[in-house]
């Protein structure tokens, strides 16, 4: 079961990192954010991650799609609040 707390926690963390990522001009900072989010995705509610990812195993872990994925995740979580 996905709890309201897990949604709020994920939203807060991902939203904050997404805002920084989108406006950052520093490659090392973007890389650090990608690593932090991938680690968070590994540890977050699997049910919540599955709902956001539509079954994609590399969701929030693919460097080439990261900005698209984190933006989508924030939108999904916002709608779940």
Where are these regions (language model features)?
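Non-transmembrane amphipathic alpha-helical segments
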Residues: 14-21, 40, 47, 77
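Short intrinsically disordered terminal tails
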Residues: 1-5, 56, 75-81
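Acidic, low-complexity, intrinsically disordered interaction modules
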Residues: 23-70
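N-terminal acidic leader/helix
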Residues: 2-32
